[in-house]
A protein has these predicted regions:
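C-terminal output helix
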Residues: 106-119, 123
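Charged docking surfaces used in two-component/phosphorelay signaling
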Residues: 15-23
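Acidic catalytic/metal-coordinating carboxylates
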Residues: 33-36, 61-65
Length: 124
């Protein structure tokens, strides 16, 4: 069962994404910001199959988190989420380390498809 770390500062979004992903049998762990997510990753030795993170968060944003994860856990797939066009542009410069950027608002089907695609790419 794939383990997925979800980082988002909005409780309702973390809950929605975790429930959607759990529908496919994935184990989810959540963090309120990038710093907490990085701490979890480090403590667990990167033992996750996918990081799904919002870009705009306090303490450590998703871009900084993605850069740290790419450095420390280069095999971990990363999906970014954003509701802002300018952040999507910022993320486009990270194509080498980010699998995809999911635009908010999204449907449950959209996020499940994005996660399935990222996990399939990890196995390829």
């Amino acid at each position: 069962m794939p383990r997925i770390l979800i980082a988002d500062d909005e409780d309702s979004m973390r809950t929605l994404v975790a429930r959607a992903i759990a529908m496919d049998g994935h184990e989810t762990v959540t963090a309120e910001d990038g710093a907490e997510a990085l701490e979890l990753l480090t403590r667990e030795g990167g033992a996750f199959d996918l990081l799904l993170t919002d870009i705009q968060m306090p303490v450590m944003d998703g871009i900084a988190l993605a850069l740290a994860v790419a450095r420390d856990f280069p095999d971990l797939k990363i999906l970014l989420m954003t509701g802002f066009a300018d952040q999507r542009e910022r993320a486009s410069g990270l194509n080498a380390i980010v699998h995809d950027v999911v635009t908010k608002p999204f449907s449950v089907a959209d996020i499940r498809t994005a996660v399935a695609d990222a996990l399939a790419a990890r196995k390829a």
